[in-house]
């Protein structure tokens, strides 16, 4: 199961390409290099074969040393162009941390305050009497309707070049999901509006501002706003799966993802990006700490999302990460601060699971044991009470029965079998790091809770 919360801006031939020299890993928790690379190769090979997935590029670094950076499979299946560490992929929602950093740099200069109401910068935007502040957009607590959750109203126009006015018009009159600060729902509208705020404050187009203030100073030569029209060297083609075969992904105008998901990059550039964050070359230490420190909701409930970054852990190892999904691509970038380890996994196929690949690599790098997963028979009454549709923001989770087993399918994602662990708890069959717990009360479960990457996400039954 792919990450449930990167879905909105949602590989056959196996070919190993060593794309850059690998340095010697720093001694410590990282296991011996040659054996580690063999293990990583096996992990990615299995992911390619299970797909099909056209290509996966990965990079693993500890501190200033690259342990491995390479590509597997084909960046372009039709022309048999192999993937490498220099292959350029669309990032999807990994873009959000770039937008967050650009915004926080303006906070540091005093041009923006996190407590500013967004109408200070977007006076024509209707907040329907709600008080929406900048920090609400950064951590998905604004309650504004996400445009990628509008169904055909948005997706029917997603091939078209849409102006800011076009897109804002879709959401401006939609009821809020909740009052700002009282709930959490992953939201592309919030990050789109942040891009508009950046443009208003700087006077520059979003793409130009990031290029001049971030990409060029850091030497991120392969990172850019991923428009369809320009020639981008080493750019991967994007694919989808249809009946077990690869097909070209649906066309998406890159005007729509904008500051919520329109960047493209390579695994090597993303390693350098992470190093820049760690070394305070982008924002100072206090600002970065603010970005990775989740706030609480109005009722005191803690979040697991900072500003453009998810905060979690794996077997006690702190983890800062974000995934992305966009037409033809799935991606993830993870950093383990206690171990100074960065892992990047980029894939050019919808339905690929870079989150799981990343976690398997992390377990190998950090020398962690595989989690134990049972597959117990499910009592009939347990099946009956859990079947239904559950909503988490604009994401729908359909739970159904299939030959005595429970299957869950998230919006625009492939169905996955749930393995019963007992006591109303299940684990995703294709990602043991994702567990699902159904409420124990009542004849039918009124909600389910997803535990993923240190995050806790509650979905309410709607039918």
PLM regions and their residue ranges:
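Positively charged n-region of N-terminal signal peptides that target proteins for export
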Residues: 1-6
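Secretory-pathway/luminal and periplasmic proteins that interact with or process carbohydrate-rich
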Residues: 66-69, 125-133, 142-150, 178, ...
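Active-site-flanking alpha-helical
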Residues: 103, 210, 219
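Short secondary-structure junction motifs
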Residues: 53-55, 67-69, 109, 113-115, ...
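Catalytic loop of the DD-peptidase/beta-lactamase superfamily, centered on the K-T-G motif
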Residues: 20-70, 199-204, 208-211, 216, ...
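Bacterial N-terminal signal peptides
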Residues: 7-18
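Active-site-proximal loop and beta-strand segments within enzyme catalytic domains
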Residues: 74-188, 195, 202-204, 229-252
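Active-site phosphate/pyrophosphate-handling residues
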Residues: 98-101, 189-192, 213, 268-271
């Amino acid at each position: 199961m792919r990450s449930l919360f990167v879905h909105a801006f949602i590989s056959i031939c196996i070919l190993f390409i060593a794309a850059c020299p690998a340095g010697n890993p720093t001694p410590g928790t990282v296991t011996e290099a040659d054996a580690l690379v063999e293990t990583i190769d096996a992990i990615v090979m299995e992911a390619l074969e299970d797909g099909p997935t056209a290509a996966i590029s990965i990079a693993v670094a500890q501190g200033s040393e690259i342990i491995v950076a390479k590509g597997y499979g084909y960046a372009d299946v039709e022309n048999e162009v192999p993937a490498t560490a220099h292959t350029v992929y669309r990032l999807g929602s990994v873009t959000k941390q770039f937008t967050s950093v650009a915004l926080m740099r303006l906070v540091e200069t005093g041009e923006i305050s996190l407590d500013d109401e967004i109408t200070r910068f977007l006076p024509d935007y209707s907040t329907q009497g709600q008080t929406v502040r900048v920090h609400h957009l950064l951590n998905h607590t604004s309650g504004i309707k996400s445009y990628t959750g509008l169904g055909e109203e948005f997706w029917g126009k997603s091939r078209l070049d849409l102006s800011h006015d076009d897109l804002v018009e879709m959401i401006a009159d939609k009821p809020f999901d909740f009052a700002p600060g009282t709930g959490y729902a992953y939201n592309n509208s919030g990050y789109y509006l942040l891009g508009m705020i950046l443009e208003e404050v700087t006077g520059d187009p979003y793409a130009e501002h990031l290029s001049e203030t971030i990409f060029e100073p850091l030497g991120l030569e392969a990172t850019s706003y991923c428009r369809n029209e320009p020639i981008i060297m080493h750019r991967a083609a994007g694919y989808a799966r249809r009946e077990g075969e690869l097909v070209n992904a649906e066309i998406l105008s890159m005007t729509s993802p904008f500051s919520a998901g329109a960047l493209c990059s390579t695994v090597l550039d993303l390693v350098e990006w992470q190093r820049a964050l760690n070394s305070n070359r982008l924002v100072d230490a206090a600002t970065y700490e603010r970005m990775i420190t989740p706030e609480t909701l109005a009722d005191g409930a803690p979040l697991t999302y900072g500003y453009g970054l998810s905060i979690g852990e794996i077997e006690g190892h702190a983890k800062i990460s974000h995934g992305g999904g966009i037409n033809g691509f799935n991606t993830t970038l993870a950093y383990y601060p206690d171990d100074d380890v960065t892992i990047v996994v980029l894939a050019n196929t919808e339905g690929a699971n870079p989150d799981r690949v990343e976690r398997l690599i992390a377990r190998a790098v950090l020398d962690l044991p595989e989690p134990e997963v049972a597959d117990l028979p499910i009592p009939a009454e347990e099946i009956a009470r859990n079947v239904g549709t559950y909503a988490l923001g604009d994401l729908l989770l359909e739970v159904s029965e299939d030959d005595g087993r429970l299957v869950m399918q998230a919006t625009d994602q492939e169905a996955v079998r749930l393995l019963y662990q007992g006591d109303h708890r299940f684990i995703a069959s294709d990602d043991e790091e994702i567990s699902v717990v159904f409420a124990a009360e009542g004849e039918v479960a009124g909600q389910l809770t997803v535990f993923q990457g240190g995050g806790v996400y509650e979905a309410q039954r709607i039918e």
